[in-house]
Amino acid sequence: MLKLFLNAGFYILLFVSCNKTDANTDPSSTGSVIADPKAIEVLFIGNSLTYTNDLPALLTNHAKSRQILIRTSTIAFPNYALLDHLSENNITMAMSKTKFKYIIVQQGPSSQAEGRAWLIEGATKLKALANKNGASLCIFMVWPAYSNYSNFDGVIKNHTDAASMTNSILCPVGMAWKEYIDRTNDLSYYGPDLFHPSPKGSQVAAEIIFKSLFK
């Protein structure tokens, strides 16, 4: 949902995920990294569904297991919609410093009309930014809280539409979650609050995102 205010205790989660053999870090400087020039740069933009279990690091590690070197940066706040990110300058600052190949964007479930509108408007604006910077926009399809499981089809449709309308790459994580849960009645992709992902759920997300990017 769109934020109404930014509590002083909130902060941007902007970090780089890479294997220690791939980069040298200065511990006194957040995000100061000398990257392997062969690494594929990936920017994640989202909220707690992205930073729970450190999804960017899981993607980095999964890619490395497939002999692909990537370097991820993340901009994420609790409860942020894409339009919240666009109202600030963190994205443009990140793009001014790094040539990203992929920009992976994530909003909440967005199953209802208002969330759908925010998702499509945000994706449209971010697509323009991605195009301007020579990057491919990727829509990370999430999932609803289990208490709203009946809204899952709306989540899938609205993310699919957002990707289609913006000619972006769809990362159909939510679709895979639903297929698995419907088939097995196993809720282990969900964490204890039955909304945020478990480590298993985040690992599945990383693998699906990888397949979507590197078909």
Language model feature labels by segment:
Residues 1-4, 19:
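Positively charged n-region of N-terminal signal peptides that target proteins for export
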Residues 37, 65-67, 132, 165:
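Short, well-ordered coil/turn elements that cap or connect secondary structure elements
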